[in-house]
């Protein structure tokens, strides 16, 4: 039987890190087994679901490259199917109408608490023959009274639930709308889901869903409940720990494959390997090797992994990822066309950058000349250096071959003649004059890329800053 997994987010909020890891694990399991990955949007919470959240989920999945084979399916478009199965269960006696009011059920549970019993619905409407007027009933599932429901979870192992402790679950509200646990069961049944991979906050729902599937004569899927992700402070991951939506990581300059690499390692490992290509993740990932303990989100580790992925791309490939971020800082296509080749700039910055945002900020100076230098850097490195700046302009202007090695030789000579052999005393003023700040890639390589004409023009403009 072909493996069929699903990712089923609710569009009540944006796609977050925990949801992405669940989607990734489901996607990897399907891809490794040559199966199918289904996307389902669980939008039955009409009051909280929004079209914007749905769009953000789809955009996030597309950016990450977590492609789906079927879907997206929307629960709100399947209401007729849910009502059909509800009618089927009522006819079979595996579900029944309950006319008890909320107050009646709460009084029942309070009596049970007073007697030291676990509060649960006592099934008084199971065999009810009279129908009260003017009362819209809910529909309850007739749960087994005794025995146990055993979940053989791929991550948590064998988990046992006593049926006597579970009451008759409401599967349709008094207005006729089906509940979450019922819709999920029908969807998984109809879509032939073989493996349900989801957060372990759903583990307690699983025995109820299994019971409904069994009552329908449906095949019960294999379950794998993934532990939650904690913040660096070991508390539940929340917006106070950083980005809320996965798309914020795109805005911050992370590569999609780097983010997936980071997430796959939160609870799973393959020896001591840290960096994985997408193909390696598919090859090595095993859902039953996921740790059942919660993992902590480490922002510094994410930055390190992103830097590793940036370094492993070709300059040409990384340049394509960089383009939107350059546009965001004002480096447009005409500027790119008139400046140095972008892959050459990328190659110079590749070992120094942790994110695409960081790289774009560093690359900007190759295409946009600084209008003025950073005041503190000008004060520290250019103040009183008019003569040195003029000498540098003359020496560099006399260079016949504009190459990094030749530029380096000029800087060395100026250091000997004007700075007691201290390279920094020449390189830093030169850097501030050309880049507008005291931080840049190696200055000789920087000038070589900028070109002779542009370098000399910037040196002359910088003289006005002093």
UniProtKB/Swiss-Prot annotation:
UniProt keyword list: Aminoacyl-tRNA synthetase, ATP-binding, Cytoplasm, Ligase, Metal-binding, Nucleotide-binding, Protein biosynthesis, Zinc
Binding site for ATP: 239
EC number(s) given by UniProt: 6.1.1.17
Subcellular location: Cytoplasm
Top-level lineage group: Bacteria
Sequence motif: 'HIGH' region, positions: 9-19
Catalytic activity: tRNA(Glu) + L-glutamate + ATP = L-glutamyl-tRNA(Glu) + AMP + diphosphate
Single Gene Ontology MF annotation: tRNA binding
Example of a GO biological process term: glutamyl-tRNA aminoacylation
Pfam families xref list: Anticodon_2, tRNA-synt_1c
Binding, Zn(2+): 98, 100, 125, 127
CDD domains: GluRS_core
Subunit structure: Monomer.
Family according to the record: Belongs to the class-I aminoacyl-tRNA synthetase family. Glutamate--tRNA ligase type 1 subfamily.
Protein name: Glutamate--tRNA ligase 1
Name of the encoding gene: gltX1
């Amino acid at each position: 039987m072909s493996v069929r997994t699903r990712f089923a987010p609710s569009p009540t909020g944006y796609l977050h890190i925990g949801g992405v890891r669940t989607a990734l694990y489901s996607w990897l399991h399907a891809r490794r087994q040559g199966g199918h990955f289904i996307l389902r949007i669980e939008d039955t919470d009409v009051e909280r679901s929004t079209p914007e959240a749905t769009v953000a989920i789809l955009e996030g999945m597309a950016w990450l490259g977590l492609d789906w084979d079927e879907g997206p399916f929307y629960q709100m478009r399947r209401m007729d199917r849910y009502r059909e199965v509800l009618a089927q269960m009522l006819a079979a006696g595996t579900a029944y109408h309950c006319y008890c009011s909320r107050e009646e059920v709460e009084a029942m549970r309070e009596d049970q608490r007073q007697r030291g019993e676990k509060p649960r619905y006592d099934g008084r409407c199971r065999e009810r023959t009279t129908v009260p007027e003017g009362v819209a009933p809910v529909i309850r599932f007739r749960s087994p009274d005794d025995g146990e429901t055993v979940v053989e979870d791929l991550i948590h192992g064998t988990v046992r639930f006593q049926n006597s402790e579970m009451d008759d679950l409401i599967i349709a509200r008094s207005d006729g709308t089906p509940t979450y646990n019922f819709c999920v069961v029908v969807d998984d049944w109809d879509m032939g889901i073989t493996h349900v991979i989801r957060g372990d906050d759903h583990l307690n729902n699983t025995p109820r869903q299994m019971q409904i599937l069994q009552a329908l004569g449906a095949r019960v899927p294999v379950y794998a409940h993934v532990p939650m992700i904690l913040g660096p402070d070991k508390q539940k991951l929340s917006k106070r720990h950083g980005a809320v939506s996965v798309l914020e990581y795109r805005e911050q300059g992370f590569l999609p494959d780097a983010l997936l690499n980071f997430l796959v390692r939160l609870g799973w490992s393959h020896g001591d390997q840290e960096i994985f290509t997408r193909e390696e993740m598919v090859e090595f990932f095993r859902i039953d090797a996921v740790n059942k303990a919660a993992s902590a989100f480490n922002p510094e580790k994410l930055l390190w992994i992103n830097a590793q992925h940036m370094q492993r791309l070709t300059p040409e490939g990384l340049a394509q990822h960089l383009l939107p971020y350059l546009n965001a800082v004002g480096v447009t296509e005409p500027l790119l066309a008139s400046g140095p080749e972008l892959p050459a700039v990328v190659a110079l910055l590749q070992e120094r950058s942790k994110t695409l945002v960081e790289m774009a900020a560093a690359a900007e100076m190759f295409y946009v000349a600084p209008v003025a230098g950073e005041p503190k850097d000008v004060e520290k490195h250019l103040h009183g250096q008019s003569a040195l700046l003029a000498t540098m302009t003359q020496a560099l202007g006399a260079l016949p071959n504009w190459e990094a090695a030749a530029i380096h030789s000029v800087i060395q000579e100026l250091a000997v003649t004007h700075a007691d052999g201290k390279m920094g005393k020449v390189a830093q003023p030169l850097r501030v004059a050309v880049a507008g700040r005291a931080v840049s890639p190696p200055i000789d390589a920087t000038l070589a890329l900028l070109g002779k004409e542009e370098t000399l023009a910037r040196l002359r403009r910088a003289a006005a800053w002093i």
